[in-house]
Amino acid sequence: MKFLLIHQQASNNAQSPVRVVEQATGRGVGWINRYLDREYVRRVANTSLRTYAHNLLHFIRWWESVHPAGDIREGDLTESTLLDYVKFQSSQQPRPSPSTINDRVAVAERAIRDEFPNAPCQIARGFHQAFLWRRPMGLGRPRAGMSRLRVKVPKRNIVPLSVEEVARFWSSFRSSRDLAIVGVMLLEGLRSAEVLALNRDDALLSEAQLRVPGKGKKFRLLPLAPETVQLLGHYLRLERPNPCSAALFVSLKGHARGTRMTAAGLRSLFRYHRQTTSIKLANPHRFRHTFASDMIRAGVSLPALMQLMGHTNIQTTLLYVLVTPQDVYLEYARAVAQHIRPLPKASS
């Protein structure tokens, strides 16, 4: 039995447009689609919904390989079901990253728990962490809790691009549209999905502001650097087709001319310029890290940077901050010069 993911027009506001079905019959996988429907009603972002569907598709394909019947029954679930799933992924070649494994397991666990509330708890020694859970306002005694099953994720330090790498990558662009795209990533710290979601009306050039649609269908208002205003102005005057869609960044050639630029088109653009410049790490998210590092070096506070980057938790912002030994030395030297009192002179 084979399964696949399909996209369909939602017939109502309670049905997810992303479905997992059997390839031969087209019959939906009930427990998965019911979970996707619940998440759709909860108004999660469409990108998150697709990610959940892909993760559950991976899980059901594994389940079918070890349970030929295909359908999941509550009696088939054991305490080690998810541990067996982790072992399977760890034996794959190429092996998925720990973050990918954890994401897949977390979504599968939520969907199974929603569908089979009386199924055995997933217990695997060494894969959980104990913690104390406190009630709101700190009332009552703390209660012991156990984290979900997950593998250890090694800490990653994503090194931002150097000044020389940015200059070399930048010089490879010729189109005003492409320069504007790189500009809003490098000077405003936008995610690639945010860049693609921008509409023409979001660019308030006369006010030097940009209205950015972020995660969770939230908007934030960002100040635009003079260089960004100039880049966007050149693109709007010289290259953006007229008429075209409401999107800010659109395709410039072919049958798709004037329509919103796609994620595949943006990936292709960066892939071409990485090959041209031989800067293998120049991707949209690396530009976001470069923006964060530049802001910290310029003296922007963490709370302000959190707002600029659209984070809801300052711990997430800290993941983008990489302080080098040279940065520490310069900060210390500046603090000593400004705030350290001179030593008193020794009495003779």
Q: Positions of the model-derived regions?
A:
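Conserved tyrosine-mediated DNA breakage-rejoining catalytic core shared by Y-recombinases
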Residues: 188, 193, 197-230
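Catalytic-site neighborhood detector that most strongly recognizes the C-terminal catalytic loop/helix
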Residues: 309, 314-334
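Basic, Lys/Arg- and aromatic-enriched nucleic-acid-binding interface segment
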Residues: 159-192, 218, 243
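Active-site/catalytic core of tyrosine-dependent DNA strand-transfer enzymes
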Residues: 226-279
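C-terminal secondary-structure termini that scaffold catalytic or DNA-interacting sites
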Residues: 3, 336-348
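C-terminal catalytic core of tyrosine-transesterase DNA break-rejoin enzymes
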Residues: 183, 288-312, 319
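Flexible interdomain linker/hinge and immediately adjacent N-terminus
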Residues: 120-168, 213, 252-257
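N-terminal core-binding DNA-recognition domain of tyrosine recombinases/integrases
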Residues: 32-48, 56-141
